[in-house]
Each structure stands twice: as C-alpha cells, then as structure tokens.
Regions:
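Transmembrane alpha-helix detector for multi-pass membrane proteins
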Residues: 23-42, 52-124, 147-154, 290
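Juxtamembrane membrane-interface segments at transmembrane alpha-helix termini
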Residues: 102-105, 142-149, 179, 319-320
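N-terminal intrinsically disordered, cationic/polar leader segments
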Residues: 4-5, 9-10, 34, 43-47, ...
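Active-site bordering "gate/hinge" segments
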Residues: 18-24, 189-193
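Generic detector of multi-pass transmembrane helix bundles and their immediately adjacent loops
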Residues: 132-134, 138-152
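Short basic (Lys/Arg) and small-residue
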Residues: 129-130, 152-233, 237-238, 246-253, ...
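Membrane-interface segments at loop-to-transmembrane junctions
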Residues: 6-21, 49-63, 88-107, 128-139, ...
Length: 425
C-alpha cells in the first residue's frame, strides 16, 4: 500500500493539465536555453543561418500548432462523448486519462509555446547571431518530434473512444486492481472475518462526509496506532457509500476520542467511485457495458459476449494471484476480505438478467461460470453453482422456443452435472 500523498501525486500525474503544463514549462526553458549557450557557437557558423529562416519556421509552427491543438481537443471531446454514449459514463474517466492523448496534446501545446517564446526572444534580439544557430537546431528537433507525434496520433485516432478500445481499458484497469487486491486481500490489514456485527468492546466512528470511499490510507492509519493498544475495524472499504448515520470504522477500548478525527482523515471520500482499490466497481462497469450492449436500443450481443470473456479473464487473474497466506503489514487494522460470491454476482447476475431472452448470452454465461468453477473450485465453485442456477431460471422464464430452452438446460446439466440436485428450474 502507498501513502496518501503518493496516491494523490499519482492521481495528479494522470491529469491532462499536469502533463500539458509540464511540457509547456520544458518548451519555454528550451527556447530560453539558446540564449545561455550561444557563446559556444563559432561566429563562422552563425552567419550561415539567417534571422528570417528561423523566424519563418517559428511563425509556421506557432500558427499550425494552435490550429492542430484546437482540432485535437475537439476530437478528444468527441471521443469522450462516444465513450459515454456507446460504452458507459463510468469508463470515460479512463479515456480522459489516456496517456497517448495527453502526450499528444501536451506536445502540441509545448511546441506552440516554444515557437511563441522563440519569436518574442528573436524579435527582441536576445539570441544574437550565434544564439540563432542553437535555436535553429532545437527547432529542427521540435519539428521531428511533432512529426513523430502526428503519426502516433493518426494511428491512435483509429481506436480512440471506440467500444472495443474503451472496454479494453476498463479490463486492463480491472486486472491491475484485482491483482493488487489479490496480493493484499485485506489491504495489508489483519483479516476481519466476522464483519457482520460490531465487535464487542468497540465504539463506532461516524463520518462527517457523504459519498463514496475512494481511497484508504492504510499506512497513516497504522501509524496512528503505532504506540496505541487499540485496534481499528474498517467497515467502509473503497467503493462503500458512507453517510453520517452509518459507521465507517470501529475503535476498540474506551470511548471515542480525539484520535477519531485523525482516523477519519485517512479515508478519502469522493462523489463518484474510482477504479483504484475498488475491484467490485471494476466488475460493475464491465457488467454495465454488457448490459448496455444488450439493450433494445443497441442490440449488440457480440459485444456482450466479448465482455463476458473479459470478465472471465479478470476473475481468472484474481484467482491466479490470490494466495492462501495473507501477509499482514498492519496488524492493528482489521479489514474484511472480498467475498467471492459478491464478485461473481456483480458481474454475471446483471448480464444473465438482461440477456435472458438471448440463447447465446445464457450459454456464454454458463460456460464462463463453469470455467471459473473448474479452474478454481475452492474460490468460485459454490458461488458459480448458485449463479448458474439463477441463469437457468432466467432462461426458463424468458420467451425461448422449446429447442433453445432444452439446449440451455442440457448445457447447464452438462457443465454443472447436477451438483445441486435439489434445485429444480
């Protein structure tokens, strides 16, 4: 687990304004460095580069980069709208954080500022004869960088905002989150298995804010209890919706004290959920993409089938990286592990419900559950069996012809082979 300031710094790096500002500062410094190093250029070389040559190139760069930046921003906004409409609004955040798009826009803005500062300094006579040579060389390097960026941008535009590309971004973010959680099942804390009721001898701590828990600073939370015999039982995990009427944690031994305020500061609350530290939100977004594809307005079952496959990959990555031995880094903080049945239900249940009338969707759901159940029976078998029967119930009550209904039933009994013979669809 990383500390709060490192997490906030990581989130800042993902912002478009940060990368654009960084590139702009570098561009301005680069343009001004030519003034400092002009003494290194021999006078015999400086006469070969005319002032008009550099000035004309910088003028072309300034005018073209401003137009290209404006055009690229309009494309970016269109891509955001496409992701919101065709995929899900929850996935737009990942499109906004796209590294290639941010680098392209930052390069264009930086090139514009470089040429602008160069023109101003050149007209002021700050470069001199020898400084113009350095400015000319740097300008050629900037032009080469712009050409490479344009080629990358053209290639990237073919997939920006598309359903497949955006879904892949959600899958990648989900896999990273699940692998991190598999390696730290309890966020580094001590497993809290009996989390359905308040532990005896503890006092409830209530939040002052309303919203979703975005991040829990386990490092700071543990440090607050370093020389303290008390323990903390974390109720509100990332993704939980908190309210002043419900406790976010329990503090052992004694009455609620001033430390409660410090404990609450370790929990970052946001208006919306995020992919970091919130595996269930990742699965919910994947399920939402599939459900939107199954809606009558879209009617794209193949996208839903693709999402089911991605969901199986996400859960498989989680199971592959999950260890039976839990490493406890913060023994004074008790955290409940993820419930396997919740994970499967978050993803498969909405898809099975919305795709009840489509034979191919029900078959894919059953096969996906079977793969997870047989691949990691100790993790998914029980939950997969329950959801498979639920899927069969949806199919039985949906408007299927007899042959389709028989096919789905036969696949169910073949894959799950009557593991629960008492249930009758």
């Amino acid at each position: 687990m990383i500390s709060r300031w490192k997490w906030m710094l990581k989130q800042t790096f993902k912002k478009l304004w940060f990368r654009a500002t960084l590139f702009a500062i570098v561009a301005i410094i680069t343009a001004l460095l030519s003034i400092l190093f002009k003494s290194m250029i021999p006078e015999s070389v400086s006469v070969k580069v005319g002032a008009e040559a550099v000035d004309n190139i910088l003028n072309i760069l300034a005018s073209s980069m401003l137009a290209v930046t404006t055009f690229s921003l309009s494309i970016m906004v269109t891509a955001y709208g496409s992701a919101t409409t065709n995929v899900t609004p929850r996935a737009t955040r990942l499109v906004v954080e796209d590294v290639t798009t941010q680098n392209v826009l930052a390069t264009f803005i930086g090139s514009f500022l470089f040429s602008l500062v160069g023109i101003i300094a050149l007209n002021m006579g700050a470069y001199g004869e020898r400084g113009r040579v350095i400015l000319f060389i740097v300008t050629l390097v900037v032009i080469a960088l712009i050409l490479i960026t344009l080629l990358r941008w053209i290639q990237h535009l073919t997939s920006l905002g598309r359903v497949g590309e955006t879904t892949a971004k959600v899958e990648q973010a989900a896999i990273e989150t699940f692998i991190a959680r598999a390696r730290n099942p309890c966020l580094g804390g001590y497993p809290w298995l009996e989390n359905n009721e308040q532990p005896k001898g503890t006092v409830a701590v209530y939040p002052k804010k309303i919203g979703y828990v975005e991040y829990v600073d386990m490092v700071k939370l543990s440090k607050l209890l370093t020389n303290d015999p008390r323990h903390v039982y974390l109720v509100a995990q990332p993704g939980s919706f908190i309210h002043p009427s419900t406790p976010v944690l329990y503090l052992s031994q004694g009455q609620e004290s001033s430390i409660s305020t410090d404990l609450l500061e370790t929990i970052i609350v946001s208006d919306v959920r995020s992919f970091a530290q919130d595996p269930r939100f990742c699965l919910s977004v994947m399920a939402e993409i599939a459900c939107r594809a199954l809606s009558p307005a879209v009617n794209d079952p193949r996208t839903a089938i693709d999402v089911i496959g991605r969901g199986v990959r996400i859960l498989s990555a989680y199971a592959q990286n999950k260890s039976d031995e839990i490493e406890v880094k913060y023994p004074s903080v008790h955290v409940a592990p993820l419930q396997n049945n919740d994970l499967l239900e978050d993803f498969f249940s909405p898809v099975a419900r919305d795709g009840a009338s489509m034979r191919e969707i029900q078959i894919r759901v059953l096969k996906g559950l079977s793969m997870l159940s047989k691949g990691w029976p100790g993790i998914f078998a029980e939950a997969a069996q329950t959801l498979a029967f639920e899927t069969l119930e949806h199919a039985t009550r949906a408007d299927h012809i007899d042959s389709d209904r028989y096919l789905i039933k036969s696949i169910y009994y073949n894959l799950f082979s009557g593991e629960d013979s008492n249930k009758k669809p």
